[in-house]
Amino acid sequence: MIRFLIPTAKEMKPSKEVPSQKLSEKSEAILTEMAKLSTDDLSIAYKIKPEQAEKEKQRWDAILAGEAKNYPAVELFNGLMYRHIKRKDLSTCEKDFLSHQVFITSSFYGIIPAFYPIQEHRHDFHTKVKVNGQSLKNYWRAEYDQFLEEGQVPVVSLLSSEFEDVFSPSLRKQLFTVSFMEDRNGILKTHSTISKKARGAFLTAVMEESCQTIDALRDLSFDDFYYRKDLSSDSELFFVRKVKKV
């Protein structure tokens, strides 16, 4: 069995509403701090325009008042990676895989199962707020580390460094990482758009093939991406797609 870690997304699209889940004490402490911030404060914290900050202020107030609607996390997040993850018309095995083997790393909720009920919000590890005098990364580090220590199974990271940096350096080394590149006339290139789309397509392929070992991941091909043994190591998997000359 393998576990997969994926990041949150700024873009959200409400889906079917589900019953709420009581916030953890750690999330409650963050909520308390976020609810204290004015619209201007949020504009600075998020580096967004005042009108956007007003929307976020309303969201935090709704969560604080217990009035915010709840949605399955993997269905609510709708960034580029999520749009390339198969989320509809899932077989029983595929839904079981998403439910038990895919976890989302959140700076508000901690590490949560894919279908965990969450509210619309904007929050990541770049958010300029301190909780109990700690940065968000330091605040969550012990709980993130505990996830790796308790699991006793291989964990594959589809995270950016923003999220991986939350783990202690010694435990971070335990993560298996996956990188995606394009071969353009013999030159290997990567950028965020390639990576985000490929992460979603990769996870979909893993789910459809029901991969349960790291070796099984190396046998995958998807969206014209193939495993490159020459670029990879024991803990780093590289997949490359050849782009035809135009």
Swiss-Prot record:
Q: What is this protein called?
A: UPF0246 protein stu1967
Q: Name one Pfam family in it.
A: H2O2_YaaD
Query: In the UniProt record, which is one GO cellular component term?
Result: cytosol
Similarity annotation = Belongs to the UPF0246 family.
Q: Where are the transmembrane segments?
A: none
The protein's matches in InterPro entries, at most eight in alphabetical order, are given as: YaaA (IPR005583)
Q: Name one GO biological process term.
A: response to hydroperoxide
